[in-house]
């Protein structure tokens, strides 16, 4: 009887302790706003979510020992509505570009609070990623041809900032020399198709997606502004101060997503396509070796300057009277801690400016590829990895040997002058006296090079014909 009574008392005590622990167990929300279709945000959102990487790093010791996590994801097509929900307290983290990020900081300050930029995810110190496109049948060949024309752009986006800088560089007045109208990318596609606008400026990936889909042609790349741009992640500063370990956990997940993408860009480009509908070749254009942008999680001086420039642009446009201080708006403490916890050297990465390297041999000759401004790639359908070639000529010869029945996802070339990665069917080519082809983004660039080498400028169809004829003559 005494034994039974003792057992009941022990059980009751255990239940009381358990009930007390349960009552005091904290549930912490981790609410992350993503931009899935803005594919250079993938390592800060889509891949973390789809690969369940955050669960690996969320803290579960110390003050987090009994914590339950309520992880929430919400996808957006632009930064402005994401910012609205962050300011409303519905989200803790958000991924967006420099310009909307500056607006995020201003919106928080207006509400008497603060947000901070905690990492870069993907960017270009030259400005690649943003671009201007025209309808595919347009006679426009460059920005100078757009004077007096209507150009649409998503207002308050990083592309908007790029467009204003490009117009200023032409010596034009944005209020009188061009007609700038606001237009979301999902509307711009049909407008370009129907020739309802003369040109459209947009951010990642639309300046390359629309040409890939055959409804537009790129006539200006953001790199021509030489103004750094990036997409990164922000966090509510109060949340970060309360849960710094969770912020570091999120960034460690981003670091792993970045590593996985570098190891197998084909695999994860296909995953991005599956989730977003953005075709895998467009994803690979950014995330593959020598891609349009550099996946870089460090706060290089150029990216800090991009934040400062965005804030100055907001003031110039009179978009805000509560702009954040660039010196404190960027906070690198969390990403430094995440690098350290991941066994990585932040300061070494900070000094590294190279794109994801291409270490490959020519698929035909087997020789190592050395000249990366003229490299070309062919991505066939199926599970086969991308094939690499030392030049467009070599790639086109290989395509000719595959025959018309070959299912080709995409062919990539690089602008000879800048090294910018391009879809081969969107490039201009110079054929020299020896039949060697050199690729360029702009016809003006091809024309100038053709004069240097006494060559002829041809389009993609003609370039393939040239190599086919050369192959037949062998």
Predicted regions and their residues:
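Sec/Tat signal peptide C-region and signal peptidase I cleavage site
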Residues: 21-25
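A bilobed periplasmic-binding-protein/Venus flytrap-type ligand-binding module shared by bacterial periplasmic
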Residues: 48, 129-139, 229-245, 430-431
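Ligand-binding clefts/hinges and TM-proximal coupling segments of bilobed small-molecule sensing domains
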Residues: 67, 150, 154-165, 170, ...
């Amino acid at each position: 009887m005494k034994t039974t009574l003792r057992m009941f008392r022990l059980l009751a005590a255990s239940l009381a302790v358990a009930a007390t622990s349960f009552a005091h167990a904290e549930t912490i929300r981790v609410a992350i706003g993503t931009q899935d279709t803005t594919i250079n945000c993938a390592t800060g959102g889509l891949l973390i979510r789809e690969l369940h990487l955050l669960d690996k790093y969320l803290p579960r010791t110390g003050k987090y020992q009994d914590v339950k996590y309520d992880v929430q994801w919400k996808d957006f097509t632009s930064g402005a509505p994401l910012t609205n929900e962050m300011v409303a307290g519905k989200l803790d983290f958000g991924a967006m570009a420099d310009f909307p990020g500056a607006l995020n900081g201003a919106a928080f300050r207006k509400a008497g609070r603060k947000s901070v930029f905690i990492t870069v995810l993907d960017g270009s110190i030259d400005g690649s990623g943003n671009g201007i496109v025209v309808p595919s049948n347009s006679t426009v060949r460059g920005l100078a041809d757009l004077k007096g024309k209507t150009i649409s752009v998503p207002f308050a986006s990083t592309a908007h900032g790029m467009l204003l800088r490009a117009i200023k560089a032409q010596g034009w007045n944005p209020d009188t020399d061009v007609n700038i109208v606001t237009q979301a990318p999902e509307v711009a596609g049909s407008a370009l198709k129907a020739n309802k606008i003369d040109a459209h400026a947009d951010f990642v990936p639309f300046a390359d997606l629309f040409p890939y889909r055959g409804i537009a042609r790129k006539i200006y790349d953001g790199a021509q502004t030489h103004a750094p741009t990036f997409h990164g992640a922000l966090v509510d500063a109060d949340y970060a101060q309360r849960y710094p370990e969770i912020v570091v956990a999120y960034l460690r997940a981003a670091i792993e997503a970045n590593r996985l993408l570098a190891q197998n860009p084909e695999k994860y480009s296909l995953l991005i396509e599956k989730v977003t509908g953005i075709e895998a070749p467009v994803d690979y254009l950014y995330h593959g070796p020598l891609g349009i942008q550099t996946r870089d999680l460090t706060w290089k001086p150029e990216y800090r300057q991009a934040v400062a420039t965005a804030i100055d642009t907001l003031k110039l446009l009179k978009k805000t009277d509560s702009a954040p201080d660039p010196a404190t708006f960027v906070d690198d403490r969390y990403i430094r801690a995440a690098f350290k916890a991941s066994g990585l050297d932040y300061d070494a990465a900070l000094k590294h400016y190279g794109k994801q390297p291409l270490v490959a041999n020519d698929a035909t000759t087997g020789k190592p590829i050395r000249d990366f401004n003229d490299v070309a790639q062919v991505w066939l359908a199926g599970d086969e990895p991308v094939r690499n070639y030392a030049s467009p000529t070599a790639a086109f010869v290989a395509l000719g040997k595959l025959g018309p029945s070959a299912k080709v996802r995409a062919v990539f070339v690089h602008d000879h002058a800048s090294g910018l990665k391009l879809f081969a069917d969107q490039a201009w080519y110079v054929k020299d006296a020896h039949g060697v082809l050199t690729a360029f983004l702009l016809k003006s660039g091809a024309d100038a090079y053709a004069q240097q080498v006494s060559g002829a400028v041809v389009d993609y169809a003609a370039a393939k014909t040239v190599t086919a004829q050369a192959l037949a003559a062998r």
